[in-house]
């Protein structure tokens, strides 16, 4: 089997939505699609991935630059992230070699395309080899699994293939977000032990809530009792002072 071709459809380096370098795999719509994506670059992220259809969109953001790629879904996010990191390193290296002053000040006038073309070509070829190697490994694992299951049941290979396809499909449609933002949405299947754990957690929360409420009520009653006792003591003190001044109830007689 030859190399998997056209895994990288588009990649570019941009700053303030201005593209400083770009590679296009051939489809002219990639440029307009990339411009749209760059306008919507996710803020507060160092890197970000999203899979739509059969394409994966990757962002690497840092120092005011955005390194963006549109790749095939067969490529793993870890491989694409390494590709973007290499693109960043090579771009900065080429920029520094062509500039004598500040890197950020002179970046607009630097012609780095001639240096980046062979580098990006090499990076894409390396990425395609990684994808092809992963595909071959998955195919071998699938064949071995089907052979071992075939000796036990005629239906087992079919079930095994279906399970692997579902797992692969679910894995490829995962959207990478700061990381943890959508982790609670990825689990759609719960077993009995998970249900029991959830029930136990709810009971603990409910019990804790009741305990807090009871403690609050007790403190409130205690506070009311103290206020009433102080009020009664003040009233009795004032009444005693009044009796002492008026010598009993003589004031009322006059």
From Swiss-Prot:
It is a single-pass type IV membrane protein. It comes from Arabidopsis thaliana (Mouse-ear cress). Non-SNARE longin protein involved in membrane-trafficking machinery. Coiled coil: none annotated. Keywords: Coiled coil, Membrane, Protein transport, Transmembrane, Transmembrane helix, Transport. GO terms for cellular component: membrane. Residues 138-173 are annotated as: Disordered. This is Phytolongin Phyl1.1. Residues 145-155 have a biased composition (Polar residues). Residues 12-113 form the Longin domain. Belongs to the synaptobrevin family. It is found in: Membrane. One of its GO terms (biological process) is protein transport. The keyword Disulfide bond does not apply.
């Amino acid at each position: 089997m030859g190399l998997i071709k056209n895994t990288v459809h588009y990649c570019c380096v941009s700053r303030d939505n201005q593209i400083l370098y770009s590679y296009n795999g051939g489809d002219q719509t990639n440029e307009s699609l990339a411009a749209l994506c760059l306008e919507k670059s996710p803020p507060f992220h160092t890197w970000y991935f999203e899979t739509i259809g059969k394409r994966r969109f990757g962002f690497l953001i840092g120092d005011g630059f955005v390194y963006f790629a549109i790749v095939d879904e067969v490529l793993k996010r870890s491989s694409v992230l390494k590709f973007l990191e290499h693109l960043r390193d090579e771009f900065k290296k080429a920029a520094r070699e062509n500039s004598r002053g500040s890197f950020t000040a002179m970046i607009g006038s630097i012609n780095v395309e001639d240096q980046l073309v062979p580098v990006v070509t090499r990076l894409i070829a390396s990425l395609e080899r990684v994808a092809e190697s992963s595909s071959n490994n998955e195919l071998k694992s699938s064949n071995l699994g089907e052979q071992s299951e075939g000796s036990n049941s005629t239906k087992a290979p079919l079930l095994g293939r279906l399970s692997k396809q579902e797992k692969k499909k679910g894995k490829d449609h995962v959207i990478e977000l700061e990381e943890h933002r959508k982790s609670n949405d990825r689990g759609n299947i719960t077993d009995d032990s998970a249900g029991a754990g959830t029930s136990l957690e709810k009971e603990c929360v409910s019990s804790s809530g009741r305990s807090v409420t009871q403690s609050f009520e007790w403190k409130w009653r205690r506070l009311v009792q103290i206020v009433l006792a102080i009020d009664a003591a003040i009233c009795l003190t004032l009444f005693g002072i009044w009796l002492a001044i008026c010598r009993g109830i003589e004031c009322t007689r006059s």
